């Protein structure tokens, strides 16, 4: 695990917007490296992004019905990002990164 300091509880202290913005940082890195043909760097960023999604799901507060819908949305994002990354679909990755931009704006 590359984010051990976050798995010790620091991630749970962040707001969902902060968590999603951090996921966005790694997804942008993965996309950038993939576009440059640096598959090794792209895969490391992709793995870090997956870890952050895992932490969001593990530490999420998804007890209410509206939060359960959000959990589904996060899982669907992961599914779409994984497919786009494995297919090297830069157009789809860009669209998914744009989705995450909205969380960075909330956080700012």
Locate each region found by the language model.
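Surface-exposed peri-terminal alpha-helical interaction modules
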Residues: 1-108
């Amino acid at each position: 695990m590359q984010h051990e300091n976050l798995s010790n509880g620091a991630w749970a202290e962040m707001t969902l917007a902060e968590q999603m913005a951090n996921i966005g940082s790694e997804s942008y890195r993965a996309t950038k490296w993939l576009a440059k043909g640096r598959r090794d760097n792209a895969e490391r960023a992709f793995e870090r992004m997956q870890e952050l999604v895992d932490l969001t799901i593990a530490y999420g507060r998804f007890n209410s019905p509206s939060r359960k819908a959000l959990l589904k949305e996060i899982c669907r994002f992961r599914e779409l990002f994984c497919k786009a990354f494995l297919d090297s679909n830069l157009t789809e990755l860009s669209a998914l990164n744009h989705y995450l931009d909205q969380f960075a704006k909330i956080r700012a």
